Amino acid sequence: MSDGGAGAKGAGFGMPRVGMGTAVQGPRPEPIRRAVLKAIEAGYRHFDTAAHYETEAPIGEAAAEAVRSGAIASRADLFITSKLWCSDAHRDRVLPALRQTLWNLQMEYVDLYLVHWPVSMKPGRYKAPFTADDFVPFDMRAVWEAMEECHRLGLAKAIGVCNFSCKKLDTLLSFATIPPAVNQVEVNPVWQQRKLRELCREKGVQICAYSPLGASGTHWGSDSVMASAVLRDIAQSKGKTVAQVCLRWVYEQGDCLIVKSFDEARMRENLDIVGWELTEEERQRIAGIPQRKINRALRFVSDHGPYKSLDDLWDGEI
């Protein structure tokens, strides 16, 4: 990926290095629409959504409004990522699910379409809580072949995965005709993903970091990132915020990153991660932060499902 701010393009498929996340708890179409318009004004060009988030429609509305107002010249100025939900992770449901996403967005294509989790559920199960009977085996090959068809049809300019362990990514790469362009995973200073990053670099798969600030305030998030004494000390010494230090650290790893704020001042603050860098000593201090995965995804673990433990889900990599 090339250097630069929110509009910087990646070498392979044009993914800006900094994207705005839109995962929210409960439908909030109007706040999302307004926030996306503010983000476009601030300089964001990459917007991350998913069928599960129920934010595709307001993103599409904001994009159309931004074109009409002249804030952007055309849809092509934006990079839109969306994701296939688990209940549509079946060979015959992938293409219809993407068509529904495109209808929601009122767009002809998405720039990146991702398998949200290496998990399949019974069709129609979109809302938590999920029950043990909802989970069915994940047919990775069948799902990926359907994803490849979405790409061949031009409905997804690039395809990829989310939350794939090293083992699952290796398995996918062993048979994929079109390799995944991206693995979107949790990355932050308390979960640095060194092993996965090395594999992705070797295989040419771009890491896109979600929850770079720890997702504090969500039902599964943690304040362990923002409360880190190491990060606070570095931020104070550099005259930056803890959030900026975290985002700069992710940026320096070569990752794309997804960060969410609906506050305009913080949107701009989160873009201010270029033009300065961490020192080698600061990088080493961050490298020494104790590691613990925040998003463990216990909701996908069931005695009666394919993943009976966290070790099964993450292949012993957490």
From Swiss-Prot:
How does the annotated pH dependence read? Answer: Optimum pH is 8-9.
Q: What induces it?
A: Up-regulated under iron-deficient conditions in root and shoot tissues. Slightly induced in shoots by zinc deficiency.
- One annotated Gene Ontology cellular component of this protein: cytosol
MF terms from GO for this chain are: 3''-deamino-3''-oxonicotianamine reductase activity; aldose reductase (NADPH) activity
> What residues make up the catalytic site?
Y53 (proton donor)
Q: Which reaction does it catalyse?
A: 2'-deoxymugineate + NAD(+) = 3''-deamino-3''-oxonicotianamine + NADH + H(+); 2'-deoxymugineate + NADP(+) = 3''-deamino-3''-oxonicotianamine + NADPH + H(+)
The EC number of this protein is: 1.1.1.285
Protein family membership: Belongs to the aldo/keto reductase family.
The name under which this protein is listed is: Deoxymugineic acid synthase 1
Species source reads: Oryza sativa subsp. japonica
